[in-house]
Curated annotation (Swiss-Prot):
One GO MF term: toxin activity
Name of the protein this chain belongs to: Small cysteine-rich protein
Annotated organism of origin: Metridium senile (Brown sea anemone)
UniProt superkingdom: Eukaryota
Metal-binding found in the keyword field: no
UniProt signal peptide: 1-19
Post-translational modification: Contains 4 disulfide bonds.
Lineage: Eukaryota, Metazoa, Cnidaria, Anthozoa, Hexacorallia
Keywords: Disulfide bond, Nematocyst, Neurotoxin, Secreted, Signal, Toxin
Length: 69
């Protein structure tokens, strides 16, 4: 039982460590001439959805649409 608890805590620790630096290193959408649109709405012309690459400062229910240069 103790071993299982140790393994679970270790796994949670590893997942936490992996998730923190990734979030910190992502630039905000605005710094890439991006704009936020509500999830489910298409991105405007000349933009592409980039929710997997950029953090959207507007909140968790939104995604980024970044301009194509």
């Amino acid at each position: 039982m103790k071993l299982q608890l140790c393994l679970v805590l270790l796994l949670l620790g590893v997942l936490y460590v992996q998730s923190v630096p990734e979030k910190r290193n992502k630039p905000e959408c605005n710094s890439y001439r991006g704009q936020c649109t509500y999830m489910g709405h298409p991105c405007p012309d000349h933009t592409f959805p980039c929710e997997t690459y950029f953090d959207c400062p507007a909140g968790p229910h939104e995604r980024c649409c970044c301009y194509k240069d």
